[in-house]
Amino acid sequence: MIRPARDGSIRPLLILFLSVLGALLLQTPSLAQAARKLPDKIPPKRTSQIQDGFGINSDLPRDPYLPWNRWWWTRMFDAGFKWIRIGQYENSSDRTSWDWIEQKRGVYSSSPELEDAVDSLVDNGMDVQVQLLYGNVMYTAHSGKLPDVSVPEPGSFHNDDRSLYSVYWPPVTPEQTDAFNKYVGWTVDHFKDRIHYWALWNEQDIGYWNPWGDAVQYGHLLTSFVDTVHKTPGAKVIYGGQADPSRDFTQRALDTCKCASGIDVYAYHTYPGYGQNMNPETMDYGAYLNESPRALRDLVTHTPRIKPDILFFDDEFNSIGTWIGSDDSVQAKYVPRGLIYNHAAGVKTFVWLLTAATDGNESDDFGIIRGLTNHDYDFTPRPVFYALQNTNALFSDTKFDPTIQVTGADVATLPRRSDFPFLSYGFRSKTGKAIVAYWLAAHSLPGNTFRTLYSTFTLKNTGIQHPVLIDVVSGDIHLLEWKQGTTDTLEALPVSDSIMAIADADYFDWPVLPEAPSSLNVTSSGNVVKLSWQVHGGDPQHVVVERREESSSARGSWQRIAELAPSAVDYSDSRVKKGQQLAYRVRATNAEGESASSNIVRIGAP
């Protein structure tokens, strides 16, 4: 404690000290202020908060293996995925497929389940691409007698299958092609206000196109597909989902099609070392021998009449923990690495798969959320789910900035010290804030056994004032300090086979919205409709119940009918008229905003 002299001589010094201190505090936020604002973990960013983000593949809900009233569907909105690719149920067809849409010759229809799923995606902020596929036995069966109806394939059906009535027989004759394009035209027009991206087929270069991928046949079908899709204003064409980065297949398909100017997106898939542990960066050096996604994109961009702004989707990517030499810890490192590696190259990545339908032929291997196996861990996230939630929060709505660089004498030694390439990329958010991602492109081993190295980095052109270190897999955030006397150099930074990121302490500038309620169920008793659901995290302060009245001619709009306490898990609606067809959903709210909505339930009032 400072005790003033009797003559008061300390007072001028105290006033001067306080004035200088105040001026310093007004100039820039102090280190202490930055530390006080810093979260311990990466705050999640929901789909509704993102304009341009990463993608996920998903089957549409289907009982009994993917029931909509379990907690899996809404988690893609909570985790901040912005794009979704639909059209397959595992390796079979789904509700958007030709054998589902046209079940009687010349009669096209959607289903309430499909309409509700699409509404859920669009209303919760997702951008949707649909694969239009496969064959239809009324037209493409390899039988001298064609059936008069199409019975959709079960979820257990999968390639390779060359039986007479397999849906993998493609439309190749003029009559078959015309029938396929009628299905395409009806579907694109029906969803024109909700879905704008349409892909032709899936992995047409392998066993999804019988008897085996045929580039010339695919090119012929692509010609009329481009014209059919573009008849609907705003609809975009995706060259759909080539399984391997074969330049020869693409070249022959485009040469046959002569429709390069009509392709809006080129899509391909990457599973480096399918079935075994190969790090994602090997997609461009070794996983495909003399082929690579980089070389494939170069071929496409140099194709005559191709659009100069053509988009590239890596719309199936994963490296699953059950593959030989891998585990869940390897997957949690590899998948974010693949996303950011592609992001720096301008490629949008779609992870395969949200949740596995275990009636398919790939068990419960691919889902970032576990599927139904009748265990207590059913529909629980794998570690990679949280790593992707962190990736989405940090890098959605960012653009690669080549002027941001990581340099330093230590950096050049990292490949020699580790035997693996060192990768670093700088990005800027939509508000101009910089974030730097770095890692060693290592072959990771099970059990988190990689030995962490340490290095000094000099960051160029970031504008970062109060640097923080972010572990993308764990989500941990730690405050850093610039090397004394510098504002761009950081010492003793950990470098490993997992993505670390450096940003400013004020990078986390988004509010945390509640997680969506899930597991909505509905029953009725007399003229009362009873609802029940589950509420989750994100500090919900209210639960809102919404209702929509259905009719044969039109779908009504959603109306809020109740606002309940955050602990509420049920509600009874007594304002029901006899014969009404009703749909319900619920969402959570807090002071920052609202969650995504739950699954939709329907019921007819008695």
Predicted regions and their residues:
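Pro/Thr/Ser/Gly-rich low-complexity, intrinsically disordered linker/stalk tracts
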Residues: 511-539, 578, 592-606
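C-terminal beta-strand-rich structural cap/linker in extracellular carbohydrate-active enzymes
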Residues: 479-513
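Carbohydrate-binding surface patches
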Residues: 410-463
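Beta-strand-rich modules
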Residues: 573-593
